[in-house]
Every structure is written in C-alpha cells, then in structure tokens.
UniProtKB/Swiss-Prot annotation:
GO cellular component, one term: cytoplasm
Protein name in UniProt: Endoribonuclease YbeY
Natural source organism: Synechocystis sp. (strain ATCC 27184 / PCC 6803 / Kazusa)
Cofactor note: Binds 1 zinc ion.
Cofactor(s), by name: Zn(2+)
Record EC number: 3.1.-.-
Family, as annotated: Belongs to the endoribonuclease YbeY family.
PANTHER family: ENDORIBONUCLEASE YBEY, CHLOROPLASTIC
Subcellular localization(s) per the UniProt record: Cytoplasm
Length: 179
C-alpha cells in the first residue's frame, strides 16, 4: 500500500562493476551504468519507508558482475556452487534493532546487491524482454531482501514478486510478464 505522504529520503548508492572473466560486451554494461540508479533507489526507499529503520540517510552498494564472480560468492556464502542472478547481503538482519544513526550524520548501511549481468541477459532473452528491464527487476528483488523480505514458500514469493512489480511501476518501468 502506498504511503499517503512521501518523505524525502537521502540515499548514497555505490555503483560498482567487476566483470573479470565475464563475456559481457562493455557497451551493454555502459548503457546500464547510465540508468538513474540513485533516483530509482531513492524512490523505492521512500515508498518502503515503513520497512526502514530510522536513520538520517541510507547507503547501499549495487555490484554488476558476471557468472564466474557471482558463482564464487554463491559458493562461499550460500554453499551453492552455481551462478545465480542476484545475491543480497543485508547489513542488518531480522527485526531492525534500535539504531542511533538517526542522530548521526553517517548513513545507515543497508548492504550489497550483486547481480550477474550474464545471467540477467540470459533470463531476459528467455523471457522476451530487455536485459535492462531484467537488471532493474533483479535490483528491486535484491533491495527487498536487504529490507528483510524473503520467499521460503510460494505464497511469500507471490507477495514479493507483486511488490517488485509495484516498485518497477513507481519508476515508470513496465514489470516483466512471467508465463
């Protein structure tokens, strides 16, 4: 449900790439980097403000990588030796503790979202939409994970995918259709 009034939320976004050993063409990556990620994340966090611990500002990292690197991370942290599309490493777990960062000028670090551009490109081709749309979709998914959302069963997955669709609509993107 959309909030009745939207408070401006300050967001610091660190946008990074690590495409060592990746087969991605640099032109596609450059196009992705020109997207207004900062504004999109800010808009999403403003909408999701009720899910955020209190802070004067927020910080997160968005890392674009390839299958090889994300497989290393997946093996190390999830014990699954295969590439995946998106990983989210939340800086805060579970119910957010009382945090004093609202009183400081330091941003509250939410965590890292890691996306395999190779996997996103493959999924986009399979699903018949653009790689850009797939990456935006995966970013929204990762952000929800940073804020404590999870999908251990079909019902929670359906709820989370619905929220992702709404996040894309908020930034003027048509959510992908899954058949």
């Amino acid at each position: 449900m959309a909030p009745t009034s939207v408070n401006k939320i300050a967001v610091e976004l660190s946008l990074q790439t690590d495409l060592t050993g990746s087969a991605m063409a640099s032109s596609g990556v450059e196009e992705l980097l020109t997207n207004p990620w900062q504004g999109w994340c800010q808009r999403w966090l403003e909408y999701l403000a009720d899910c955020l611990p209190p802070a004067s500002s927020y910080e997160l990292t968005l890392l674009f990588t390839g299958d090889r690197r994300i497989q290393e991370l997946n093996r190390k942290f999830r014990h699954q030796d295969k590439p995946t599309d998106v990983l989210a490493f939340a800086a805060l777990e579970g119910d957010f503790p009382l945090i004093e960062s609202e009183e400081t000028e330091e941003p509250l670090y939410l965590g890292d979202i890691v996306i395999s551009l190779e996997r996103a490109d493959h999924q986009a081709r399979e699903r018949g939409h653009s790689a850009k749309l797939e990456v935006v979709w995966l970013t929204a998914h990762g952000l929800l994970h940073l804020l404590g959302w999870d999908h251990p069963d079909e019902a929670s997955l359906t709820t989370m995918l619905s929220e992702q669709s709404h996040l894309l609509t908020l930034i003027g993107q048509n959510p992908p259709l899954f058949t």
